[in-house]
């Protein structure tokens, strides 16, 4: 994997504005969707880089790793240390979220996408889309970058230049990429 030095880095204390000097190096993760965790209406591409919610339940084994009630899927690899980032391309569809989850995140039953459930995420929701400039939506897809600084307990989201930092307590647990996809949504790991 390549090491990248970021030109811009954001911090909540600075109002989400880019800082002039990056605080170190980050390792780009080659993230793949873990089809054994995918909710039954999610279809993972053969190369495991794209997932789509087709809205129709697929015939899949009901294994313990699979999300049973929420249209979610996890990615790999997982992280227990270091500074990592991954990028995800999204379309103009609504109802999606991208982030990180504790490896022990609840798989059976409905999830609340909150830190108390070991999920740190950002995305596009229906009400946000109604408030969004329609010209922006017509431009097509965008990109969200998720940064993890495990030792500092920080998850940083850069969604098309809008940066948010979330403080997290991982309690030594492995964290993995996390995705929520509403009906018709497709996401691609870059």
UniProtKB/Swiss-Prot annotation:
| One of the record's GO molecular function terms | toxin activity
Please give the InterPro entries that the UniProt record associates with this protein: B30.2/SPRY (IPR001870), B30.2/SPRY_sf (IPR043136), Butyrophylin_SPRY (IPR003879), ConA-like_dom_sf (IPR013320), PRY (IPR006574), SPRY_dom (IPR003877), TRIM/RBCC (IPR050143)
Q: Which residues form a coiled coil?
A: none
Its localization reads: Secreted
What is the tissue localization of expression for this protein? Expressed by the venom gland.
Fetch the PROSITE patterns from UniProt.
B302_SPRY
GO terms for cellular component: extracellular region
Which segments constitute the B30.2/SPRY domain? Answer: 21-127
User: Domain of life of the organism in this record?
Assistant: Eukaryota
Disulfides per UniProt: none
UniProt keywords (A-Z) are: Neurotoxin, Secreted, Signal, Toxin
Give the primary localization class: secreted
| SUPFAM superfamilies hit by this protein | Concanavalin A-like lectins/glucanases (SSF49899)
Signal peptide start and end residues = 1-20
Query: Which residues, in ranges, are excised as the propeptide?
Result: 128-190
Q: What does this protein do?
A: Neurotoxin that produces dose-dependent hypolocomotion and hyperalgesia in mice. May directly act on the central nervous system, as it is 6500-fold more potent when administered intracerebroventricularly than intraperitoneal.
Similarity annotation: Belongs to the ohanin/vespryn family.
Q: In its UniProt entry, what is this protein called?
A: Vespryn-21
């Amino acid at each position: 994997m390549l090491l990248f030095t970021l030109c811009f880095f954001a911090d909540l204390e600075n109002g989400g504005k880019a800082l002039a000097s990056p605080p170190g190096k980050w390792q780009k993760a080659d993230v793949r969707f873990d089809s054994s965790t995918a909710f039954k209406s999610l279809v993972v591409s053969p190369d495991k880089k794209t997932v789509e919610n087709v809205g129709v339940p697929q015939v899949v084994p009901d294994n313990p790793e699979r999300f049973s009630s929420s249209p979610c899927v996890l990615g790999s690899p997982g992280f227990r240390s270091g500074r990592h980032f991954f990028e995800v391309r999204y379309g103009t569809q609504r109802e999606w979220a991208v982030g990180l989850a504790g490896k022990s995140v609840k798989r059976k039953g409905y999830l609340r996408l909150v830190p108390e459930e070991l999920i740190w995420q950002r995305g596009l929701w229906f009400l946000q889309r109604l408030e969004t400039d329609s010209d922006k939506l017509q431009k097509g897809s965008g990109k969200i970058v998720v940064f993890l600084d495990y030792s500092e307990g920080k998850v940083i989201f850069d969604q098309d230049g809008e940066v948010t930092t979330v403080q997290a307590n991982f309690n030594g647990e492995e964290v993995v990429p996390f995705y929520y996809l509403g009906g018709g949504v497709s996401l691609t790991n870059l």
